[in-house]
Every structure is written in C-alpha cells, then in structure tokens.
C-alpha cells in the first residue's frame, strides 16, 4: 500500500510542466518576500539614522507629509531660540538650523540629470544634523555645493560626474562641487547642500522650509509645541 506522501510524489512526476510552473511561482513569492523585507529594514535603518530624539523640526501646518511644500517666515529661527529655553547655545551660537528644502532638476556636465533634492543650509546645520560629516573637500562658499555620497545614485549619474571640482546645474545656475559628505546612512546622503542665501536667491524665495532645533538633554519639546500653538501657521 502506498503512503499518502507517495501519491504526491507520483503526481509530481506525472505532470512535470504543472509542477515546474508551481515551483517557479513559489520561488517568485519567496523572492518577493525577501525583497520587501529587505526594503523595509533598509528604510527603517535610514529613518533611524536620520532621526535624533533631541532634534525638533518646525514647519508649516499641513506639510508633514511633504516638507517641500512647507513655507515659514525667515525670522522663525530667531523667534524660536528667544522663546524656547531648552535650546542649546554654545560660544554665542544657537543650535537652530534654518533650511530651505526642495526637489529640483539637477544636471551634471555629461548627463541629462534627474530630479535631485537640494537643501539650503547655514553653518549651524552640522551642529544640529550631527550625523553629517564632511569626508572630502570643503564646506560650500558662494556658488558652491557639497554632495552626499549617494547623490549620484539619486540622480542616475556616475560618481565621477559629481567629483570635487566638477560642476552641476540647477535652478538656472551653474554650481561648483566643493566637497562630499556622509551621514551614517541617513537620508541626507542623497541630497545636495548649498548655502541658504544662495538657494533663496536662485529660487526667488525669502522664506524657509523648516527649522531644525537641537534641544538640551532633559529638555522637553513641549515648549516648542506651545510656541507653535501660539502661531497657527506652524507645526
């Protein structure tokens, strides 16, 4: 008498095409599961690296899903630091980073380019975005940018096209690449950073997108929340 599992084995041999298709379907499902799990874990690691429990972001109301749509007055950082006691201040410098963040078409010298992420920052940015490290070159001056180590992949360009000394074009202006930075796997690594004033000029904007505020250890973000509630345009 044949055992139950032997019937299954015999059926597999009787229908080889159907068996092969079934095995291919199962293998595809398993592969997709691994791909999705890998993507989720990579996204979690990127978000973990990008986040800082002591950093609070202030942006316009209803822009949390897309910071690019945020627009707040340029005077907001000074109002924040004057109103919130928990802000870190060292050597007379407040750890508050005003930033203008936008997606724009970026073109390299030998490439049609693609949609890139540009962030206009000041010298206060690395004080707040503490995972960012300048690994090569120099901090950008007038008409210059520094690129994240994954910016080339974001644009679909070769690494050598975004090397120091090369130039890129966005917002109708040519920019020289002065440096490269890393951020420990954070999302900033796919961005291009330039001076805030330069980015405001070429984009014809006087506002900013957000303020990143570094709070002192033990401070509560409740003070920042109270400040935002007093101003109905902030969140």
Predicted feature residues:
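N-terminal Sec/SRP start-transfer signal
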Residues: 1-32
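Hydrophobic, regular-secondary-structure patches
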Residues: 27, 31-117, 135-136, 226
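Extracytoplasmic
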Residues: 51-55, 75, 91-96, 111-116, ...
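A conserved hydrophobic position in a structured secondary element of the catalytic/binding core
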Residues: 59-60, 72, 121, 147, ...
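Flexible glycine-/small-residue-rich
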Residues: 60-62, 100, 120-122, 172, ...
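Mechanotransmission and gating elements of multispan inner-membrane complexes involved in transport
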Residues: 84-88, 107-113, 151, 159-161, ...
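Short beta-strand boundary microenvironments
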Residues: 114-158
């Amino acid at each position: 008498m044949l055992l139950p599992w032997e019937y299954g084995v015999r059926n597999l041999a009787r229908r080889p095409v159907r068996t092969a298709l079934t095995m291919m379907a199962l293998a595809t499902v398993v592969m997709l599961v691994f791909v999705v799990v890998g993507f989720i874990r990579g996204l979690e690691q990127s978000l973990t690296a990008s986040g800082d429990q002591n950093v609070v972001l202030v942006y316009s109301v209803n822009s949390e899903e897309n910071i690019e749509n945020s627009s707040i007055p340029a005077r907001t950082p000074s109002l924040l630091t004057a109103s919130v006691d928990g802000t870190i201040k060292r050597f007379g410098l407040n750890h508050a980073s005003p930033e203008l963040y936008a997606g724009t078409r970026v073109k390299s010298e030998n490439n049609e380019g693609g949609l890139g992420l540009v962030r206009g920052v000041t010298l206060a940015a690395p004080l707040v975005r503490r995972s960012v490290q300048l690994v090569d070159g120099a901090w950008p001056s007038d008409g210059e940018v520094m690129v994240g180590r994954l910016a080339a992949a974001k644009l679909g360009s070769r690494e050598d096209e975004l090397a120091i000394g090369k130039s890129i074009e966005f917002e109708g202006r040519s920019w020289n690449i002065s440096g490269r930075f890393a951020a420990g796997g954070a999302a900033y690594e796919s961005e291009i950073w330039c001076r805030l004033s330069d980015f405001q000029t070429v984009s014809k904007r006087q506002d900013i997108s957000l303020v990143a505020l570094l709070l002192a250890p033990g401070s509560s973000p409740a003070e920042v929340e109270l400040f935002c509630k007093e101003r109905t345009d902030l969140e």
